[in-house]
Amino acid sequence: GLDDAILIKDNHVAVCGGVDAAVRRARAMAGHLMKVELEVDGLDQLDDALALIGEGLAPDVIMLDNFSLDDLREGVRRTAGRITLEASGGVDLTTVRAIAETGVNVISVGALTHSAPVLDIGLDAV
């Protein structure tokens, strides 16, 4: 369901005043069993999230949104397996292998929902 985790998006980060404040707020609201995922759009935000590891407040998953392949590799290097990394944005059949080879743990494919072909179904009541 949509109630078993917290996803911190870019607008949440902006409203809270930055990654640190947004993650701290989410952690304060989340129970110890609730996962927290953070979307970041640059290596600077990734570094802000990684800085919370020492306090035990870092997100469980960090979504690297629309990162280049080089930045994905660098994110994997900086994270060094301490947090699950998800790649998102620009994923399709032509890019998925190269994205997987960067070393991220998870790849999300938005095209499965926003670009899926429409099936025309009709129903006749009898």
Regions of interest found by a model, annotated:
Residues G1-D71:
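Glycine- and Gly-Pro-enriched alpha-helical subdomains that act as flexible
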Residues D3, V13, V91-D92, L112, ...:
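Gly/Ser/Thr-rich beta-alpha loop segments that engage phosphate groups in nucleotides
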Residues D4-I6, D65, G89, G110, ...:
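Flexible, active-site-adjacent loop/turn segments at secondary-structure boundaries
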Residues G42-L57, F67-A80, L85-A87, V91-V109:
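Catalytic cores of alpha/beta
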Residues A98-V126:
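Flexible C-terminal active-site loop/helix
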